[in-house]
């Protein structure tokens, strides 16, 4: 509990001068709350130091690399220095770092005056655009955002994340296996994945085979005892299992909360629209004032993956900007497959999914938290305060702050490489061309490869990549890149949904997941999640006219999905488990975050830890905003870890009270720092 009753301010008449003083007192109290949060030491996995000068799993994208794909140490050191060095007051930061190929400056690239690359790093592009346009270079996205401050909520240094899984760990092997499996299941319907079926295997792997193979891995096999896990690692492992402690098709690729593991894979908030009857909500059209939002999405073309050869992989690591070459499918459909969800999270706006969910709940009459002073009585309606405008604005407020907070983790602390990089290191060991990898690195990567092969993933990945290369070559000149490495027909590179690969920022934490964690926390805090004002029984989706779960239709032509006729309408879901509003909101956060894993650009831990970072950013903002209300206000929700969280304001003080899943009180400061190593000494 965090209680600021010592900083009470006196009630005064509403005279102009007195109001000004009271406003200042409130701001001072908010500053005291902010000062009470101890800066947290975020632990790292130590690989940037342990693997120095090689950095097989660090984020090196955009920097000069040698012909084997290893970064120039001089450029990497310059990159880290440019990220971490303090600002100079009154002067802009040049961020003068080598960017892109150094064999002749590519459009958008950069060669600092002080940087003189050795010949092995002065390389050019390997591929060319078929349309004849020059390949250009992408810039890093907000690499200095970790130095920016905010005036609401915890500072970016006050909330920590756990260390990312390290090379050699069972956890890293498991989450690399998940990303490989998702790449091969991109065109398999979610309903088939949740059922663990065998009907569809367009890339050589069925949902059942994926489940069986993943279950062979120690981290995902509940019967295997793993010694030496930290409590945090044990929590992440337990999140892969159901309530009985089993790994099942229903938990495979799902989020870490009970709601995310219940019912159909996709949250109803990604599918349904608004309306007064099921026939209307199944149209998937959301009322947005005088406009309408259609839940159908434009998708990437099915069956087309990228970066399956070393040449295109290499150019992407050098920062090639080829996003405009992505092939799209015709028409719009309801999200039916992992590729379609990946398509959504490639182009979605920052808080789009949560805005849509908020609109659905608003129009369907979900009602706000019973602890609000407006909206529940006869004479005061909620609008500017505790109403729709208040809540919708708050979603955007927390989203931007969450995004800046996770940028500090990404660039300033972890600098974790993307899955596409780890897969390339696995491929190097598998192909017998390890390059600069040390003996210890080779041994760890070899063990990972053998475990991935035991899971039944390496052979179908190699076969799929070979088939993709052959298809790209046979497309009558329509594939947008030339110069692909067709000689590497058995690569174990990660097939990517996006032609440009991952974004130009590190993997850990994940921006989508952090924003999801923050925005869904606001939705759970603002809308009434429970059946009674003093109870914790969750409200069902029935209460907002969405009781019958739906999923997109799937039309099959033998063992193939007919994508032209699938996803055209919503039908009754096979799984009709009764769903709760809070559970579907938690599932929405998981869908958006793990949708990035389906594209191949993130790991599971990126989702898990970032979700909780965003949640804490939102709670600290809500805590401070409680000071601005001159009368009693409260809001409550269940956290992603299952804690019961109550935020209260009395009109002159604020408190945050938390009870864990076991019913015992949890210290608020300890809750905020749950992922931290230890508080930073003052």
Predicted regions and their residues:
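Hydrophobic alpha-helical bundle signature of multipass membrane enzymes
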Residues: 1-682
């Amino acid at each position: 509990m965090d209680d600021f009753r010592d900083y009470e301010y006196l009630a005064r008449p509403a005279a102009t001068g007195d109001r000004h003083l009271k406003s200042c007192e409130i701001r001072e109290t908010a500053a005291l709350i902010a000062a009470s949060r101890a800066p947290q030491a975020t632990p790292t996995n130590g690989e940037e130091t342990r693997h120095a000068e090689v950095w097989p799993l660090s984020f090196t994208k955009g920097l000069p690399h040698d012909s084997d794909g290893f970064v120039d140490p001089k450029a990497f050191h310059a990159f880290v220095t440019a990220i971490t060095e303090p600002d100079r007051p009154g002067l802009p930061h040049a961020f003068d770092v080598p960017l892109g190929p150094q064999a002749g400056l590519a459009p958008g690239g950069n060669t600092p005056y002080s940087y003189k690359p050795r010949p092995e790093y002065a390389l050019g592009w390997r591929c060319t655009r078929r349309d004849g346009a020059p390949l250009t270079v992408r810039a890093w996205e907000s690499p200095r955002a970790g130095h920016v401050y905010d005036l609401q909520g915890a500072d970016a240094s006050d909330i920590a994340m756990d260390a990312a899984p390290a090379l050699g760990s069972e956890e890293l092997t498991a989450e690399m296996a998940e990303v490989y499996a998702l790449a091969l299941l991109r065109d398999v319907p979610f309903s088939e994945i949740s059922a663990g079926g065998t009907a569809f295997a367009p890339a050589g792997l069925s949902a059942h085979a994926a489940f069986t193979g993943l279950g062979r891995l120690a981290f995902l096999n509940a019967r295997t005892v793993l010694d030496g896990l930290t409590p945090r690692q044990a929590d992440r492992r337990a999140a892969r299992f159901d309530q009985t402690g089993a790994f099942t098709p229903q938990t495979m690729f799902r989020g870490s909360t009970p709601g995310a593991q219940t019912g159909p894979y996709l949250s109803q908030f990604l599918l349904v629209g608004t309306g007064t009857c099921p026939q209307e909500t199944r149209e998937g059209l959301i009322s947005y004032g005088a406009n309408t939002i259609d839940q159908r999405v434009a998708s990437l073309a099915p069956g087309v993956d990228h970066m399956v050869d070393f040449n295109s992989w290499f150019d992407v690591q050098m920062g090639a900007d080829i996003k405009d070459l992505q092939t799209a499918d015709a028409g719009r459909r309801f999200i039916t497959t992992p590729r379609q969800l990946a398509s959504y999270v490639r182009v979605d706006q920052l808080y789009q999914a949560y805005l849509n969910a908020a609109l659905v709940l608003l129009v369907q009459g979900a009602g706000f938290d019973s602890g609000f002073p407006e909206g529940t009585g006869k004479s005061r309606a909620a609008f500017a305060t505790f109403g729709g405008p208040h809540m919708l604005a708050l979603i955007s407020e927390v989203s931007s702050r969450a995004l800046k907070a996770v940028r500090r983790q990404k660039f300033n602390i972890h600098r974790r490489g993307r899955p596409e990089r780890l897969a390339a290191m696995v491929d190097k060991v598998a192909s017998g061309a390890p390059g600069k990898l040390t003996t210890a690195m080779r041994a760890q990567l070899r063990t990972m490869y053998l475990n991935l092969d035991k899971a039944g993933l390496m052979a179908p990945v190699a076969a799929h990549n070979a088939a993709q290369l052959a298809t790209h070559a046979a497309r009558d000149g329509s594939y947008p890149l030339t110069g692909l490495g067709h000689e590497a027909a058995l690569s174990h590179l990660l097939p990517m949904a996006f032609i440009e690969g991952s974004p130009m920022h590190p993997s850990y934490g994940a921006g989508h997941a952090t924003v999801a964690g923050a925005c869904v926390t606001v939705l759970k805090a603002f809308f009434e999640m429970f059946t009674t004002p003093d109870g914790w029984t969750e409200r069902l989706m029935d209460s907002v006219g969405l009781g019958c779960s739906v999923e997109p239709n799937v039309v099959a032509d033998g063992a193939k999905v007919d994508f032209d006729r699938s996803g055209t309408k919503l039908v009754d879901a096979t799984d009709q488990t009764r769903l709760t509003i809070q559970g579907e909101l938690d599932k929405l956060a998981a869908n958006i975050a793990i949708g990035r894993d389906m594209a191949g650009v993130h790991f599971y831990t990126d989702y898990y830890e970032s979700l909780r970072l965003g949640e804490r950013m939102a709670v600290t903002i809500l805590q401070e905003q409680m000071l601005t209300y001159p009368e009693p206000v409260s809001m409550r929700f269940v956290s992603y870890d299952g804690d019961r969280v109550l935020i209260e304001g009395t009109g002159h003080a604020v408190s945050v009270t938390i009870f864990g899943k076991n019913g015992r009180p949890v210290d608020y400061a300890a809750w905020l720092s749950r992922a931290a190593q230890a508080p930073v000494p003052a």
